[in-house]
Structures are given as C-alpha cells and as structure tokens.
C-alpha cells in the first residue's frame, strides 16, 4: 500500500455513508478498538500477504454505495466539521497515534478513490446497498488446543472472517517430532561421540574400557555400573601395593644389616689377623731390629710433640705481641685523655709532665718485675747484689727529690699576728689530725690535714671569722710539696 499524507485526507471529501449520519468515531478512524469486519471476496492467502496493494476490483466490492446525492452533500458538510475537530485533536496526540492515523488514512484514501467509480456503476444498475468497509484482522484467530495441556495432539489455530468459512492452521509435522538428546559439540562444531571400548590405554586401570568417555563425532558412551565394586577393587589394589612395598623395604633393610654385620666381621677378622701376624714377625725378628724400629717410632713421636710445642709457642708469641700492641694503644689513649682533662681543669704543663714521668716509671718497674718473673732460675741467681743496692740508693735519692700533691688549707689575713701558726694549729688539731702546719707566706698560714673532709670542714667553719681581732679568710689549694723540705 502507498502512504498518503494526512493533509490529503483532511482536504478531500469522503464519499462513504455511515448509518444514521452520526458523527465519525475517532477510534474508528485511528484504527483502535474492535472494527466490524465484512466479508470480502479475497482469499485468506491474499489477506495474509498484505504487502501488495489491493486491486481496484476488490476494493469496489468492499466500499459501500451512495444512494442519494443529497445525502452525499450532507455527509460532506458533516465531514468538514469533523475534520476541523480531528485536526485540533491530532495536534495533541503522540507519535504512536499519528503513525496509526497515517496507516489507516492511506488505506481509506485508496478506498475513497475507488468508491466514486463504484457509485456511478451502482447508480446505473439501480442497486442501493449500504455497506461499511471492513478490514480483515488477525484478532479473530482462536487457538483450538491449550498449549499448557499435556498430550501429543497438535496445536491448531482457527481463523474466522465474516462471510468466509473458518479455516484451521496446524504446525508442520516436524514441530511435533519427539525431542532428541542434545549432542555436545566442540567450539569448531564437531560433535562429541562415544569412543569404542577397544580404545583403552595401559596404565588407566583394569576397567578403563568400561568408563564413559567423550570424543569427537557425537553421542556419549553409557555410564558404567557397579561403582562400589570398582572402588573396592581399587582399595584392594592400593593395600596390596603398600604391603608389597613394606615387604621389599624390610628385605632391603635386613639385607643391608646383614651386609654391614658381615663387613664388620671381616674388618675385625682382618685387624686381628694383622695384629697376630705383626706379633709373630716381632718374635721372629732379632732384638736389635726391634730396638731400632722402636727408636724410630719414638723419634717420630718426639718430632710430632716438638712440632706441636713450636706451634703452641708461635701462637703464644703472637698473642703476646697482640696484647703488647693493645697495651700501647690503650696507653696512648689514656695519655691523650689525661692531657685533655688537665687542660680542662687549668693545670700547668709542668704538672702534666710530672704525672707522665711518674706513670712511665711505674710502667718500667712493672715490666722489670714481669721479666724477672718469667726469666730462668739461673739468670735470677746471676743477678749481683750490687745492682740491688744501687737501685735502692737511687730510689731513696729520688724519694727525697720527688714531690707529692696535697690539699692544703690557706688562712690569710694574719700578717699582724706573730703567733698565728700556733693558734691556727691548735684550732685545726681540735677538728682532726694534721700532717703539717707552717707559714707559707707573710700573710698566709697553710695546713695539711690527713683527711680531705676535715680540710673542707675547717674552711666552712672558720671562713670569714675573727681571730684575735683579725678577720681571716680560709681557702683550699692543691700543692705539690715534699714535706721533708717544709720548715
């Protein structure tokens, strides 16, 4: 069918008469709802194949005839009024209704063109028949059988058209064929079929031929029965193999033990036979040869002992060398630390030199003692007594010249007091024992206590006090003195 625009429908009068000259139903024009169907002379095959346009002769039979020209004019007037209302309503309709309207109007346009010619022919023949055009539809189809009903009877469809006999349509015979098993297929389309029983392979069990397998070709082999029997057989085989493995291991271990015991017995027998043979040879050999052999054996033993001793001596010497290096390194570190400490305390370089000299002498004395301790006894006896006397006299002379550090208490402000030494000595003796009390300067009297705590207590107790009308000041000072030289 050809499509015609809606404007052609609205501008062209319709020559169709409706019963009672009533208003045109919009649903009738738009194709919605139930539409009365009238019989046609078309066959059902022509109705189903509606893709081709209707012939002019068929449309003449379906279009109603007009009986009166006055009625045509009245219908035209009423159609014009209805067209205005339809135009207003179609502006508000959605896209779906417009499509249906265009489809229906295209069919009506063709029918109206043919209706004019039909009216002229009918007027000539004097036939006055009023019919409403009917459009066959598939809504009249009914299903004879319930598809949900079980059974093998085919499903039929009845097509009812007014004026035509009912026609029943059945599906093709292939639709009712029994369903076949779905054959699995490979991605390339080859079906999977069962492999014959002769395709068994060694190593897959006794019943490998009876197992279900899939292969290319379609179908599936039957599933084997008697799974319990197969499982029991498998378990029996595994237990038998395990017991067989244990037996073989036991036999191997027993064979190993027997072999080891036999080898031990052979070695013992060889050693015993060798020792017996050696004793027999020693009895047969002359005494001189035996003594010479024993001497050689003793010499080798002594040589090994000497080697071990030399090795131990070398190791001991290396240890002593390492220890001497460590001692020297520690001495250097202590010397540097002592110098830094003395500088931090504000001591003079002379004091630091004296301390280092004393340390060096002490180290020298310790070294000589170690040498005498490790020296042989003969060398100790050869040391003359004169050396000892000389060393003792030199030590006595050094002790006279050597000074010692003391913590002295200085009392100042006693220049105008002649008996200041006696008075201060008496006061210090009351506090604790003293080593020395003397006038170190015209205005200073110095005291050395046996204990440093007493010197501190004296300073705290008498500093700033008045002695015989004179205010004295007490302070502490570290002095390097030789008390034998102090008057």
Swiss-Prot record:
Cysteine pairings via disulfide bonds: none
Report biased composition (Basic and acidic residues) as residue ranges: 97-132, 273-338, 358-383
Q: Which domain of life is it from?
A: Eukaryota
Bias (Basic residues) occurs at: 241-253
Composition bias (Acidic residues) maps to 54-96
Composition skew (Low complexity), residue ranges = 254-264, 385-395
Coiled-coil intervals in this record? none
**What ranges does the record give for the region Disordered, renumbered to this chain?**
35-153, 237-345, 358-395
Q: What is the protein's given name? A: Uncharacterized protein ZK643.5
Q: What is the lineage of its organism?
A: Eukaryota, Metazoa, Ecdysozoa, Nematoda, Chromadorea
């Amino acid at each position: 069918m050809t499509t015609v625009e809606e404007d052609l429908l609205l501008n062209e009068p319709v020559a169709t008469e409706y019963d009672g000259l009533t208003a045109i139903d919009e649903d009738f024009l738009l194709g919605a709802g139930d539409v009365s169907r009238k019989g046609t002379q078309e066959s059902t095959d022509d109705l189903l194949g509606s893709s081709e346009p209707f012939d002019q002769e068929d449309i003449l039979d379906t279009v109603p005839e007009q009986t009166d020209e006055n009625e045509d004019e009245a219908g035209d007037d009423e159609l014009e009024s209805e067209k205005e209302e339809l135009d207003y309503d179609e502006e508000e309709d959605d896209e779906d209704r417009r499509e249906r309207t265009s489809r229906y109007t295209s069919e009506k346009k063709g029918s109206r063109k043919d209706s004019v010619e039909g009216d002229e022919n009918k007027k000539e023949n004097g036939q006055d028949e009023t019919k409403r055009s009917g459009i066959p539809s598939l809504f009249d189809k009914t299903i004879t059988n319930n598809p949900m009903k079980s059974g093998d009877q085919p499903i039929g469809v009845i097509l009812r058209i007014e004026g035509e006999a009912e026609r029943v349509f059945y599906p093709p015979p292939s639709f009712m064929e029994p369903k076949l098993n779905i054959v699995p297929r490979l991605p390339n389309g080859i079906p999977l079929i069962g492999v014959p029983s002769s395709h068994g392979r060694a190593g897959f069990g006794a019943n490998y031929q009876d197992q279900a397998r899939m292969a290319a070709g379609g179908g599936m082999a039957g599933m084997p029965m008697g799974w319990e029997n197969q499982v029991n057989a498998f378990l029996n085989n595994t237990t038998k193999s395990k017991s067989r493995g244990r037996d073989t291991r036991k036999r191997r271990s027993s064979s190993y033990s027997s072999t080891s015991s036999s080898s031990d017995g052979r070695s013992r027998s060889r050693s015993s036979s060798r020792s017996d043979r050696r004793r027999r040879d020693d009895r047969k050999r002359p005494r001189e040869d035996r003594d010479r052999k024993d001497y050689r054996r003793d010499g080798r033993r002594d040589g090994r002992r000497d080697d071990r001793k030399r090795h131990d001596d070398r190791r001991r010497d290396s240890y002593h060398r390492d220890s001497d290096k460590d001692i020297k390194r520690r001495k250097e570190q202590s010397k540097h630390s002592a110098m830094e400490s003395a500088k931090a305390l504000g001591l003079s370089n002379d004091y630091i030199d004296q301390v280092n000299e004393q340390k060096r002498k002490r180290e020298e004395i310790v070294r000589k003692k170690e040498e005498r301790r490790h020296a042989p006894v003969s060398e100790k006896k050869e040391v003359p007594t004169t050396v000892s006397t000389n060393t003792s006299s030199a030590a006595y002379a050094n002790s006279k010249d050597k000074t010692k550090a003391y913590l002295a208490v200085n009392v100042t402000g006693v220049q105008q007091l002649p008996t200041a030494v006696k008075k201060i000595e008496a006061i210090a003796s009351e506090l604790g024992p003293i080593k020395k009390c003397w006038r170190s300067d015209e205005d200073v009297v110095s005291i050395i206590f046996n204990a440093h705590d007493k010197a501190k207590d004296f300073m705290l107790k008498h500093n700033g006090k008045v002695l015989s009308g004179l205010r004295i000041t007490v302070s502490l000072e570290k002095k390097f003195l030789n008390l034998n030289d102090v008057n």
